[in-house]
Structures are given as structure tokens and as C-alpha cells.
Amino acid sequence: PERSPEVWFVREAMLQSGVALFLDVHGDEGLPYVFVDGCEMLPSYTSAHAQRERAFTDAFGRANPDFQTQHGYSRDKDTKVNLALASKWAGDRFGCLSLTLEMPFKDNANLPDPQTGWNGARSRRLGGDVLQAIHTVLAPG
């Protein structure tokens, strides 16, 4: 708790309450795309995880024109099984859909905007649209 008290307190709250879905949102300086990175390389990953992830990415793709699934991190990236990363730890510990959502720092190569590039308005829209995908995965029935 001394080094990162905010991480410790959030982790403790998660352990007490449980987690239905975990989304760690980042900006990627190298890849000019909006994408998610899942937990498919973890030993605890199952076909049920894959189905939830597919439902999420399908719904997110319908909701937001910036989101895509063709470009992202390679499957052999060394962080794919690193349980020190929040999304990997949460996915392994809680068995929930757990993803890192990456967005570009400058612009989306698939849908460039020469006037503004990637900006706050696009980030806000992405945040609103991700709620539709979350609802699709978590809604009963």
C-alpha cells in the first residue's frame, strides 16, 4: 500500500465486492487504432470468456465507428500473461470479461480527422459507446 495506495484500495474493494467486467482504458503512443487487448493467453481463459469477448467487440463495433478488431497487440506480446497488469490480474482472479481498451494519442488511422485528430470529443463518444457494449454483455437474458 505504501508505493501505490490507490491501487491497493481499489484492489481490496474489488476483492470484497467481486467483478463482473473489468475495463482498463489507455492511450497507445505507437498504434494509431482503437482496439481491445484481452486475456486469451492466460491458462484460465475458457470458451465462455471468448464468447463474452466476442459479444463485447461485436457490440462495440456496432456502436462506435472508431473501434476495430483487425489491428492491436500481437498474440505473442510478452505482456499477454503478465498478471501484474490490471486487466490480466482481474480476468484471471475473477473469471470475468477483462480487457484493456487502447485508443490512439494522435489520430485513428482507420478514420482520420485531419482537422482535429484524436481529441476529447472522440474520447467522450468512445466512452459513451462502450457503455452499450458493456450493457450487451452484462444485461440479463
Regions found by a protein language model. Name each.
Residues 1-141:
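Structured catalytic-domain cores with a bias toward divalent-metal coordination
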